[in-house]
């Protein structure tokens, strides 16, 4: 084929130009032609050629107007005679139904003409009867033909097209297709007519065969008295349904009677002789079905009422309180700074002073209120045995915990033993109890980066707080200026020099582990297992060189505090003049740190970039879940997260 195209292109009389490509879709099993000029698809070759001639003749420079023909048009000249023969045959027999009808009509017309020719002229009555007979014959012929044609597909499947007389070789034309559609629609209509006729015939037969039942309201005229002996025993009428008994109607009655018997037995055990009983032994008259149904419902209601009345209510017995003895304990000797003895005459004056102090405490500045905390040891604890007894626990630095027991019988007697704190203590208590904003600030500051470990066991956590504080951990590394700025005033110059030497040693070691302090800038970021190994190596080296005993959690806390402090200084634009000398010195040491950093969890190997996620993770390690904004405590993590979504989102 390529050689043939080369020969054509080599000759000067033939010019070839690429107009399209063949496109094949394997999913749909379709072939189409793609036009290069307008980027359109055509499923047939003649359409594509006509499209080129009509739309792209200016590009292709066709020499003739009609130089594109379809295969059908080319073959039309050869088969012209065959088409003419087919048309004549189609006009003669357009469809099988029409030909059969014409033949039947011709046969009937010939028979009628023969009869008319043989016989004498007919009367009008005979003509009408004969026309009716002819119509019935036509209808029966049509019905028989349709029945035969409908039964053929059921008996056997047609695998071949239907044969037609004188049209086996010729192809179908438009007129033939029209005749086929006309025949098909006529068959459908005749089948509908046939169904209607059959329905009417069936209805007429059923109407004739039906026996009308006698009317229910009709009465027979009785002229003689009825004799019961002459009435036969058999009756052809439908027997009446038996009247259901009361036991069948009231289904719940049996269960109610059983429940009533159980209640009566239970009442007899408790010696309650006045229990209502049901009287079911009275003989009931025979009732109709409606009356029996209504009586059964009424009996159910009455029985349920008796059952409700039979229940015994439990009453609680209350006895008046009798005071047998009043013991007044001796007053315990306590220091005057904590507790002052109060007489009965001065109680009202001190209560008024306490209320004034509480009102004044609300107007205190926030700086003074931050120093005071409410202690559990100063609160009153009620005794579990009696509601009139309580213990008052007071804790001081000089003396251990002192418990004073106060026993009272009424509110008036208890005023003699009430002891009120001094004015300073009441101010502290009121200011701490009434200022929720201060507590919010405390929680937010504490949760930002806690120096203590958020471990699950509270006992170990408290022991760790008692032994080592955050400032002491930072002192071991030489970085106390991160949290406590005015520490230089309390330290001697020799101590400051030793702290700075420790800081230099720690920073030299810490600078080696760039995968920890430069975690966010390393691409791709290191895996948590590798970073946990690096932190373990860092702690081991720090403990060896600086002669201290720090855990991995302590090193993680120091790293988090250093990164947060460095980030706050650079983001808040703090002047260097306002910072202490020790803080400036440490800031110069940490000049290699980037601004972006990551949070390392103390209890596990997780690493967080966002602060919110880190705080949520810290709370998940604690026993209770506490909100940092509204100071609510939750038992489970799901409740806490739902509260954050609903209240603070």
UniProtKB/Swiss-Prot annotation:
Zinc finger (C2H2-type) in chain: 33-56, 599-621, 625-648
Organism per entry: Drosophila melanogaster
Protein name per Swiss-Prot or TrEMBL: Protein teflon
One of the record's GO molecular function terms: zinc ion binding
Effect of residue 211 to M: In strain: MW6, MW9, MW11, MW25, MW27, MW38, MW56, MW63, NC301, NC304, NC357, NC361, NC390, NC397 and NC732
Resulting phenotype, residue 349 to N: In strain: NC335
GO CC, any one term: nucleus
Task of the protein: Specifically required in males for proper segregation of autosomal bivalents at meiosis I. Expression is required in the male germ line prior to spermatocyte stage S4. May have a role as a bridging molecule maintaining adhesion to hold autosome bivalents together via heterochromatic connections.
Residue ranges, compositional bias (Low complexity): 88-104
Keywords: Cell cycle, Chromosome, Chromosome partition, Meiosis, Metal-binding, Nucleus, Repeat, Zinc, Zinc-finger
Similarity annotation: Belongs to the Teflon family.
Principal localisation: nucleus
SS bonds (residue pairs): none
């Amino acid at each position: 084929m390529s050689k043939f195209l080369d020969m054509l292109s080599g000759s000067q009389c033939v010019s070839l130009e690429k107009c399209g490509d063949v496109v094949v879709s394997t999913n749909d099993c379709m072939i189409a032609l793609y036009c290069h000029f307008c980027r359109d698809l055509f499923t047939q070759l003649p359409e594509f050629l006509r499209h080129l001639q009509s739309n792209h003749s200016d590009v292709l420079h066709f020499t003739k107007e009609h130089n594109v023909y379809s295969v059908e048009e080319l073959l039309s000249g050869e088969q012209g005679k065959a088409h003419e023969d087919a048309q004549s045959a189609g006009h003669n027999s357009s469809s099988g139904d029409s030909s059969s009808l014409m033949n039947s009509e011709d046969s009937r017309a010939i028979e009628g003409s023969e009869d008319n020719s043989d016989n004498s002229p007919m009367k009008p009555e005979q003509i009408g009867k004969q026309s009716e007979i002819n119509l019935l014959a036509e209808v029966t012929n049509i019905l028989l033909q349709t029945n035969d044609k409908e039964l053929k597909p059921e008996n056997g499947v047609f695998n071949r097209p239907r044969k037609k007389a004188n049209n086996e070789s010729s192809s179908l034309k438009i007129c033939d297709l029209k005749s086929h559609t006309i025949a098909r629609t006529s068959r459908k209509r005749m089948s509908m007519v046939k169904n209607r006729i059959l329905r009417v015939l069936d209805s007429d037969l059923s109407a004739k065969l039906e026996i009308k039942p006698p009317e229910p309201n009709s009465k027979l005229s009785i002229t003689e008295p009825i004799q019961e002996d002459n009435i036969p025993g058999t009756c052809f009428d439908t027997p009446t349904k038996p009247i259901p008994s009361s036991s069948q109607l009231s289904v719940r009655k049996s269960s109610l009677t059983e429940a009533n018997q159980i209640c009566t037995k239970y009442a007899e055990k408790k010696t309650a002789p006045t229990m209502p009983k049901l009287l079911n032994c009275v003989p009931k008259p025979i009732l109709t079905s409606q009356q029996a149904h209504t009586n059964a419902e009424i009996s159910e209601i009455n029985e349920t009422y008796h059952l409700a009345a039979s229940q015994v209510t439990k009453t609680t017995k209350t006895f008046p309180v009798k005071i047998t003895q009043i013991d007044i304990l001796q007053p315990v000797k306590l220091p005057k700074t904590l507790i002052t003895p109060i007489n009965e005459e001065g109680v009202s004056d001190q209560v008024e002073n306490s209320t004034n102090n509480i009102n004044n405490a609300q107007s205190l500045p926030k700086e003074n209120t931050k120093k005071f905390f409410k202690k559990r040891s100063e609160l009153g604890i009620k005794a579990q045995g009696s509601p009139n007894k309580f213990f008052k626990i007071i804790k001081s630095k000089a003396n251990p915990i002192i418990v004073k027991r106060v026993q009272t019988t009424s509110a008036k007697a208890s005023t003699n033993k009430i002891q009120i704190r001094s004015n300073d203590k009441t101010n502290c208590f009121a200011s701490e109890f009434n200022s929720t904003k201060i507590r919010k600030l405390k929680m937010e500051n504490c949760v930002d980066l806690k120096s203590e470990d958020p471990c699950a066991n509270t006992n170990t956590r408290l022991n760790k707080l008692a032994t080592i504080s955050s400032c002491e951990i930072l002192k071991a590394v030489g970085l106390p200026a991160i949290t406590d700025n005015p520490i230089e005033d309390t330290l001697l110059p020799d101590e400051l020099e030793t702290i700075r030497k420790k800081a230099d040693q720690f920073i030299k070691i810490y600078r080696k582990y760039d995968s920890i302090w430069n975690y966010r800038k390393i691409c791709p970021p290191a895996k948590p297992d590798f970073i946990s190994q690096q932190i373990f190596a860092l702690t081991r080296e720090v403990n060896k060189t600086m002669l201290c005993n720090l855990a991995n959690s302590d090193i993680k806390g120091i790293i988090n505090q250093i990164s947060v402090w460095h980030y706050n200084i650079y983001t808040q634009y703090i002047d260097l003049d306002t910072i202490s000398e020790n803080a400036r010195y440490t800031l110069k040491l940490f000049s290699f740190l980037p601004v972006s950093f990551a949070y390392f969890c103390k209890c596990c190997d997780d690493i967080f970039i966002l602060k919110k996620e880190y705080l949520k993770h810290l709370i998940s390690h604690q026993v209770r879940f506490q909100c940092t904004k509204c100071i609510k405590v939750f038992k489970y993590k799901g409740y806490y997260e739902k509260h954050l979504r609903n209240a603070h989102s």
